[in-house]
Amino acid sequence: MKVKSSVRKICENCKVIRRSGKVIVICSNPKHKQRQG
């Protein structure tokens, strides 16, 4: 899980979603997991 100020999609499988007020990226590739913070 990377914590970044600006999250963006890295590949076409990445999905940007909001979870309890936080913007996160989920993907089939675990290296692409990101959270805004």
Swiss-Prot record:
What are the BP-aspect GO terms? translation
Which domain of life does the UniProt lineage start with? Eukaryota
Coiled coil regions, renumbered to chain: none
- What are the protein's UniProt keywords? Chloroplast, Plastid, Ribonucleoprotein, Ribosomal protein
Please state where this protein is localized.
Plastid, Chloroplast
Give the Pfam families listed for this entry: Ribosomal_L36 (PF00444)
SUPFAM superfamilies linked to this entry: Ribosomal protein L36 (SSF57840)
Cystine bridges: which residues?
A: none
- Predominant cellular place of this UniProt entry's protein: plastid
Gene Ontology molecular function: any one: structural constituent of ribosome
GO terms under cellular component: chloroplast; ribonucleoprotein complex; ribosome
What family is this? Belongs to the bacterial ribosomal protein bL36 family.
Name of the protein in question: Large ribosomal subunit protein bL36c
- Name the source organism: Bigelowiella natans (Pedinomonas minutissima)
> What's the encoding gene here?
rpl36
